[in-house]
Swiss-Prot record:
It is an enzyme of class 1 (oxidoreductase). The active site is at C50. This is Glutamyl-tRNA reductase. Pathway: Porphyrin-containing compound metabolism; protoporphyrin-IX biosynthesis; 5-aminolevulinate from L-glutamyl-tRNA(Glu): step 1/2. SUPFAM superfamilies: Glutamyl tRNA-reductase catalytic, N-terminal domain, Glutamyl tRNA-reductase dimerization domain, NAD(P)-binding Rossmann-fold domains. Belongs to the glutamyl-tRNA reductase family. GO terms for molecular function: glutamyl-tRNA reductase activity; NADP binding. The lineage of its organism: Bacteria, Pseudomonadati, Pseudomonadota, Gammaproteobacteria, Alteromonadales. During catalysis, the active site Cys acts as a nucleophile attacking the alpha-carbonyl group of tRNA-bound glutamate with the formation of a thioester intermediate between enzyme and glutamate, and the concomitant release of tRNA(Glu). The thioester intermediate is finally reduced by direct hydride transfer from NADPH, to form the product GSA. Homodimer. The keyword Oxidoreductase applies. The record marks H96 as: Important for activity.
Length: 423
């Protein structure tokens, strides 16, 4: 009952290659059925996101078979994934899944979205009946591990992107961030990320000012903000408790004078200004004004660097949790293997006994002496039951296989007097 994991991710493959190997929602059901039809595969789950595509399987299946299937399904050249994939089995595969779900293998260490994506992959596989008892238990335990990692370590805490760091700073400065009015200058990717993070924090009043009104309108529609032209800046600044600027301008857009005027109109209610642009959008002299608090991307970067160090330490703590849970699952899996072996051995023994008993009863019915029949029955049964152990003993002796000899010796060794006393 081997667990296997094969895939590619942001560490091993380019965006272009990851896009070619990703499974769309429309492809997923057929892909799951196709994987299940591979020789040796008993259960399967496919995790496919923008940063990774991974196959998790239970069964006796080779990495080459899985790799060949993945390459063929997406109609890639036979060696397209040769140097870009990874393949784990057993404990390594279990540890990898738990690390992925906990955010330890993500592009941004500790990001929480991956857990939801793994859950969706598991649910999709359940709907296709490609999850059985083993993967069911593995994924449920993985979800518990990810929750424990999130609750007991700081791996998902502290900002590690400039956009999120800006919002985190605003949250610490403004106790009621939800009631603050925020002005975003610029309508690029960074400004949009800031807007998304603000929305997640409950901010409802967001203004977007951009040189081209159309682009401001497009972004405002996506994030639920109001769009303005940059020419309206002097009217917008007094309304803003928080200003976040991120444009591609080569010259400052916001000067000391404009903030001074805005503060007067605000009756000197404080303003937080965060300049994410390089070169700067906001004049450095703004810091000379009372009630104006200016932070630059360099200020945020030092916070981010410290937070990354904190997350890396938390990741090491998380790995301890994952290793413990991997061992627990693997021990359970091994116990199933031994139970299955015992069941097979008993079934085999009973089959042999039943065959000999059937012959013995037939001979007795034919009038043969029961004592002689039973003696032959006993002799034949012993021969059949000892044939394989005898062959193993001979082979072990010839090859000086001390381990096998010791194991076989335990089959008929009497318990020591010391051990029997302790019972």
């Amino acid at each position: 009952m081997t667990i296997s994991a094969l895939g590619i991710n942001h560490k091993t493959a380019s965006v272009d290659l990851r896009e070619q190997v990703a499974f769309s929602a429309e492809q997923l059901d057929a892909a799951l059925q196709a994987v299940r039809n591979l020789q040796g595969v008993e259960e399967a789950v496919i995790v496919s996101t923008c940063n990774r595509t991974e196959l998790y399987c239970r069964g006796e299946v080779s990495g080459d078979l899985l790799l060949g299937w993945l390459t063929g399904f997406h109609k890639l050249a036979p060696n397209a994934l040769e140097n870009h994939h990874y393949h784990f089995q057993g404990e390594q595969a279990i540890t990898h899944l738990m690390s992925v779900a906990s955010g330890l293998d993500s592009l941004v260490l500790g990001e929480p979205q991956i857990l939801g994506q793994v859950k969706q992959a598991y649910q999709a596989a359940k709907r296709q009946a490609s999850v059985g008892g083993i993967l069911e238990r593995l994924f449920q335990q993985t979800f518990r591990v990810a929750k424990t990692v999130r609750n007991e370590t700081a791996v998902g805490q502290n900002a590690v992107s400039v956009a999120y760091a800006a919002v985190s700073m605003a949250r610490h400065i403004f106790a009621n961030l939800q009631k603050s009015k925020v002005l975003l200058i610029g309508a690029g990717d960074t400004s949009e990320l800031v807007a998304q993070h603000l929305k997640q924090q409950g901010v409802t009043e967001i203004l977007v000012a951009n040189r081209t009104l159309q682009r401001a309108s497009e972004m405002a529609e996506r994030v639920g903000a109001t769009a303005h032209s940059l020419s309206e800046l002097s009217e917008l600044l007094p309304q803003a408790d928080i200003v976040v600027s991120s444009t591609a301008s080569t010259l400052p857009i916001v000067g000391k004078g404009s903030i001074e005027k805005a503060l007067k109109k605000r009756r000197h209610r404080p303003m937080l200004l965060i300049d994410l642009a390089v070169p700067r959008d906001i004049e450095e002299q703004v810091n000379e004004l009372d009630d104006a608090y200016l932070y630059t991307v360099d200020d945020l970067q030092s916070i981010i660097s410290e937070n990354i160090r904190n997350r890396e330490q938390a990741a090491r703590e998380a790995q301890v949790i994952i290793q413990q849970q991997t061992k627990e699952f693997n021990d359970w899996l091994k116990s199933l293997n031994s139970v299955e072996l015992v069941r097979e051995y008993r079934t085999h023994t009973k089959t042999l006994a039943d065959e000999q008993l059937k012959k013995a009863l037939a001979q007795i019915e034919q009038g043969k002496d029961p004592a002689e029949v039973l003696q032959r029955f006993s002799h034949r049964l012993v021969q059949q039951l000892t044939h394989k152990p005898t062959s193993l003993l001979k082979s072990a002796g010839e090859n000086n296989d001390q381990y096998t000899l010791a194991v076989l010796q335990q089959l008929w060794s009497e318990p020591s007097s010391d051990s029997s006393k302790g019972k």
